Each structure stands twice: as C-alpha cells, then as structure tokens.
Amino acid sequence: MIDKRDDKPFKLKSKYKPSGDQPQAIESLVDNIEGGEKAQILLGATGTGKTYTMSQVISKVNKPTLVIAHNKTLAGQLYGEFKEFFPDNAVEYFVSYYDYYQPEAYVPSSDTYIEKDSSVNDEIDKLRHSATSSLLERNDVIVVASVSCIYGLGSPKEYADSAVSLRPGQEISRDTLLNQLVDIQFERNDIDFQRGCFRVRGDVVEVFPASRDEHAFRVEFFGDEIDRICEIESLTGKTIGEVDHLVLFPATHFVTNDEHMEQSIAKIQAELAEQLQLFESEGKLLEAQRLRQRTEYDIEMLREMGYTSGVENYSRHMDGRSPGEPPYTLLDFFPEDFLIMIDESHMTMGQIKGMYNGDQARKQMLVDYGFRLPSALDNRPLRREEFESHVHQIVYVSATPGEYEMSQTNTIIEQIIRPTGLLDPEIDVRSSMGQMDDLLGEINQRVARDERTFITTLTKKMAEDLTDYLKEMGVKVKYMHSDIKTLERTEIIRDLRLGIFDVLIGINLLREGIDVPEVSLVAILDADKEGFLRNERGLIQTIGRAARNVDGHVIMYADKMTDSMQRAIDETARRREIQIAYNKAHGIVPQTIKKDIRGLISISKTSHNDISKEEMDYESMSRGERKEAINALQKQMQEAAELLDFELAAQMRDLILELKLMD
C-alpha cells in the first residue's frame, strides 16, 4: 500500500511580487477555479510574466497540475522556471524519451518494411519515472510535459499495485524481495550498478530505482526480517541517511503480473487465430505467415521474459481494454481533481488534435500487411475528445488564443501590462523595394548599440540568400533552420545573447518561446503574403519577440496592407495604449528585461570534472598540449550536452573558443 503524502502545500518562492495587471489576473483565475469554472483563457501578452502568474495560481489553488507545452524546448524552459519557483515541491518533466525515433512502418509501393529504430535518452526516461512515482506518492506535484503525455503509458493501477513497499522490521526474506524485483522488471547486475538494477552482497540488497540517477537504497536483512534501509550514493556506496519507508515502483511503465500475463497472452492468441483466418480466406498467405511468425515470437518472449520489443502494441490486451477504448496515459496518473494549463495553447491544442490521425494511418498499413495485429491500433495517442474527457479544470495560456479555445469558454482574462513597464513595440511598414539595403542599415545601428536582430523570412531559399548577403557585408549572422536539433537550437540562442553573432534568421522558429531581451529589432519579410506564418496570430507572436527590450521595434516589409497586418497592428496599438496609460498613472519608466544567460534546462549535473582555467595553466602549454586539452574539453562538452546540462556544456564551449584564439 502506498502512503500518499497529501498534506504538503505548494510553496512559491520568488523575489518578485505580482505587479502590473498580474494581481487582477491571478485573483480572477483563482476565483474562477475555486468557483468551479471548467475552462478559462489567460490572454497574456509576451513578456508579461505568464509563467509567474501560472505559478501564483498553482500555489493558491493547491491542486496537482499538468502544464503542457508544444515542444521539448518550451517544456524545458518552463520546467526550469517552475523548479526555481517551487524548490520544495515536486516539479517533474515528462517528454518523449527518444533522442531518435523511426516508427515501424510499411510502404506497399516498394514492398519496404521499416523496422522501429530508436535511441532512448536515459536521463529523460529517469525523469518520466520520477513524474509517475511522484504523482502516486504525493499531491504537491507539477508535471511539465510535451504532447507526448497523451500517448499510451500503461495502467496506473498495475503500476501502483506492482510497487514493492519496504519498512524496517518487515518480515520478508531476501529471496522473496529478489523475486519481487525481477517481477517488476529490475535486473540483477552486481558489476554495473545503474538505474533499474539491483545487486546482492550476502544479506544486503542494493536497489537503484528507475526514477533516480545519483542515489540508491541499501536494504539490510537479519534473517527473514528487514533490519535497516539506507539511502546511499550510487557511485561510492556512502550512506546518506536511514529511511523508514521505501516504495520501489516498476522499472518500466508497461508491467503486469504472471496471472494477468497469461490472460493477456490468451487474448493475443485468440486475436491471432481470428486474423489468420481472415487473411487465409482472402488468399493473403504471405501476410498470414508473416503475422504468425512475428506474433508467436513475441508471445514466447512475453512468457519467458515478461517483456518483448514492441510490447506497447499489445497494450490493449495487457490493460484489459475493449477494442477502441482509449489507452491509459499520464493523465490517468493524476487524481480526479487536478488542474491542466496549456501553454501556447493556439499551437498545443492543434497538436493534440492532429496526433491521432497521423498515428492511425501508419499503423493501419502495418495491420493490413500482416506486420501487426489489429489491436496495435489501440496503442495510440488520445483523440481530442478523449483528452477533453480527462479535463476537470483547464487554463489556456496564449498571447493569441486559437478558435478552439475561444469556442470552449467566454472567460478571458487579459494580462497586458509588463512588470518592467515595457511597451509593445512600434511597427513600421516599409516597401520591399530596396529592403536589403534598408535592413542592413537598421542592423548596423543595432550592432553599434550591442543589440540583436531577428529576421523572419517565408522560404528557406530567401533565408539562405539573405544569410549569404549579410555575411558578405560583414554582419555576424546565423540561419536557424528546421534541421537543427533541440540542443543545438538552445546553443544558438545562447550564442546570440552572448553576442557571438548579432543577427538570427529563421522561418517558423522565431515566434513562440524564444526569449532574448537583447533583441531590439524584428524584421518581417513578405509580411503581406497571407498564410499560416503571416496571419494575424502569427504576426502578433512574431511582433512579441521585440517586446522584451525598451528599444523594441518591428519593421514589416510589404507592398500592400493585408487584413491580417492591419489587425495585428491595431491590436498592438491597443495594447500599447493600455500600457502607456498604466505607466503614466504609476510613474513607471520602462526597462529592458534582465535575464541571466543560462541553458534552457538544467536537469542534472554531469559526473565529469570541469577543466577550468584556474585548474590548468593553458597559456604555458605548447600548441600540441593545447590541442589535446581542446579535444578533451570537446568530449566533455558533448557528454554534458547529452545529459542536458547546457550550462556546463556552454562553459566548456566558451573555454574551447578562448583556447583556439591562443593559437
């Protein structure tokens, strides 16, 4: 039985106090939640402190909260901010744990079967386990997630019921504990002690939970009784302290007991027989042979090991669900009365809607050609209406709410005033004739003031041509395209803030969540080309990138005024008017946002020693020695980045740059 700690309140720690229209927004949101309002919108302009407002609301309503962002980068940024606001509570991070993922697929036109290929990030897997275990053990939990939280995860009841609960004085033999650990997918490894493993030394069993990365537990037996349980450092074995209760959750989210496994296998066999009969009646002998071979192999693995590659495709049988019934997801791990906050809801809700259809189209092909049983179709993300059925209370957060959110509620709470007094930027509309020379002049003005520039284009070719042109003109510029990975994107933003380059060019990467106070100019090329990237919502989001600097300015290059441009300009002017009036009434002088230059997310520290300039005298080294030092630093930098410790990786990157300049 898991003893859930439900008496610990959320405790917000911050040097800031609500200001501007934050107090009114916080009070309205809290009153509506406590009054039972199901859905409401926080319409917060860029830079008004929406995350701080969300934190204040969470601390006041005191409910377990799920915050959903539309990509890993934004989820990481929010995770870092919530960790700072709630250091004494459980702030968790739940995103897809794949560094690389090629889903299983079949292309009939070329008779090509593509096997599932993936690379799991061990650090993120640990954080996912930490999230689910926290939800089952306590109520003061904030989980920051990407939309991967609506994918199948395994039954929370099976996960909780399989947990092993241990206390000093408990009567249980060492061998019984070992069998229980194997049943919940822990592996015995007396040499390489890592997450999801245990090791045995006489009457001592050491267990490394799947949700930890530095600390494990030592269970000491005296006969058939637990004598003592200690928390230990996993690397050194040094005792940190004694614990009076230890709960060990399964090492995988897909777990079942022996009796349930046999029932599941019987259902898989029955479905297999039915599908084989169908294929044979249709003359699809190759498909029938393929399906029999693959499924019987999986059944054998499930019987022998309790697990098989692709076990999630049998999750309907494992969970005891009916055909078409929605899968269990992270949302099922929350108690009934929980709060959902959707960040950048105009993007995130669109993703939630689109996940199901794309998944089904790919899997149907696998079923039709005998690679998977039809039940594999029920290993899927939730449909939007299924997601809605989990919603008890929800807050949509966006500077530009979408039509869906607007259709869900009439309760819209505006947050327009920035705590720093910053105004929405002034907007110029200029002709596209001679735009390159005009833009170069504007960039040079910003470079002279040590400020940065964002440029957004509509096509990859224009972005590349503009990058080449500006480089020829002596501008330090980078182009951020869609092929750049998340970690690299984070480094590019950091380099821009540090002034390693002055201009960043992109297509659809400059709109939400890129927080660079040093940017004082946003240039929008082809502003009059109506479409997804140049509609009212997209333009307002892009304009918002210049709203964190006191000298923020936006230039739209266009040959005509579109309705979207006019509406975006009018809305920005409306907000400016409100902000100017507030500043005047309260004697506020606008100030550029001050924000530390750090990685977007820092989850854990690497175990590697940082080679600092103080520790090693690089200047007295020979060129060859410095080259060796650079190679060593580059290796450590890569390892730090893989562990998502961007701050350490960035420090090493800066040191490498300095060393290269010495030569």
From Swiss-Prot:
DNA repair as a keyword of this entry, yes or no, is: yes
Q: Where does the UniProt entry say this protein principally localizes?
A: cytoplasm
Q: Which Pfam families match?
A: Helicase_C, ResIII, UVR, UvrB, UvrB_inter
Domain Helicase C-terminal per the UniProt entry, residue ranges? 435-601
Q: Where is the composition biased (Basic and acidic residues)?
A: 1-10
Q: Does the keyword DNA damage apply?
A: yes
For the region Disordered, what residue ranges are annotated? 1-23
Family note: Belongs to the UvrB family.
Question: What NCBIfam families does the record point to?
Answer: PRK05298.1, uvrb
Under PANTHER family, the record lists: UVRABC SYSTEM PROTEIN B
This chain's protein is named UvrABC system protein B
Organism this protein belongs to:
Streptococcus pyogenes serotype M4 (strain MGAS10750)
* Gene name linked to the record: uvrB
